[in-house]
């Protein structure tokens, strides 16, 4: 079972994917976490690309990102959750090739939505050191634009569920579980 979560920064993707991972006992992979881990481990290609792209609110090159993700996916088989991948048309093309090559399909895509006001509140509370709010806003603008083709593709497949991410963690989780159960 492959489940994908997409949404803007601070929409609760990490919280909800981790809860669902525990509930279903399947691993979750976050592009952001994989990139931050490689950055902390001083992976030269990632460090340079992160400075060039992410600090300006832009996506890292797809082949660089997907190489990190593919290493993890190849270890787990056909049951996993993805946090914010695919996030662009380019991501989607590479991911579709991966799915085809491995005979896999996506079960459900959960799109978490929040307002800019809520995003700012969560940003202030979370206070991640590597971000400032203007970069986060720019990242959201770019990601919202890039995500359109991804959302349309999964909507056309009939596997997209849009969930309001502004409720309590429990309320959002309940709605996600309801969406997943209605897919059966």
Identify the role of each PLM range.
Residues 1-184:
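Glycine-rich phosphate-binding loop of ATP-dependent small-molecule kinases
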């Amino acid at each position: 079972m492959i489940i994908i979560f997409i949404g803007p920064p601070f929409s609760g993707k990490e919280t909800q994917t981790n809860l669902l991972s525990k509930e279903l006992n399947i691993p979750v992979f976050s592009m952001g976490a994989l990139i931050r881990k490689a950055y902390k481990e001083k992976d030269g290609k990632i460090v340079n690309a992160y400075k060039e792209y992410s600090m300006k609110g832009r996506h890292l090159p797809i082949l660089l990102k997907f190489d990190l993700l593919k290493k993890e996916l190849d270890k787990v088989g056909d049951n996993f959750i993805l946090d914010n991948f695919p996030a662009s048309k380019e991501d989607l093309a590479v991911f579709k090739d991966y799915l085809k090559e491995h005979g896999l399909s996506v079960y459900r895509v959960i799109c978490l939505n929040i307002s800019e006001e809520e995003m700012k509140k969560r940003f202030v509370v979370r206070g991640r050191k590597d971000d400032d709010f203007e970069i986060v806003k720019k990242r959201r603008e770019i990601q919202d634009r890039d995500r359109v083709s991804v959302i349309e593709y999964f909507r056309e497949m009939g596997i997209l569920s849009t969930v309001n991410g502004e409720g309590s963690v429990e309320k959002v989780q309940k709605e996600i579980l309801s969406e997943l159960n209605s897919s059966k």
